[in-house]
Amino acid sequence: RPPGFSPF
């Protein structure tokens, strides 16, 4: 996912 969330 986008930066600040999960790596995807």
Swiss-Prot record:
This is Des-Arg9-bradykinin. The keyword Transmembrane does not apply. Expressed by the skin glands. Belongs to the bradykinin-related peptide family. Produces in vitro relaxation of rat arterial smooth muscle and constriction of intestinal smooth muscle. May target bradykinin receptors (BDKRB). It comes from Phasmahyla jandaia. GO terms for cellular component: extracellular region. Its main location: secreted. GO terms for biological process: defense response; vasodilation. It is found in: Secreted. It comes from the Eukaryota. Keywords: Amphibian defense peptide, G-protein coupled receptor impairing toxin, Secreted, Toxin, Vasoactive, Vasodilator. GO terms for molecular function: toxin activity. The lineage of its organism: Eukaryota, Metazoa, Chordata, Craniata, Vertebrata.
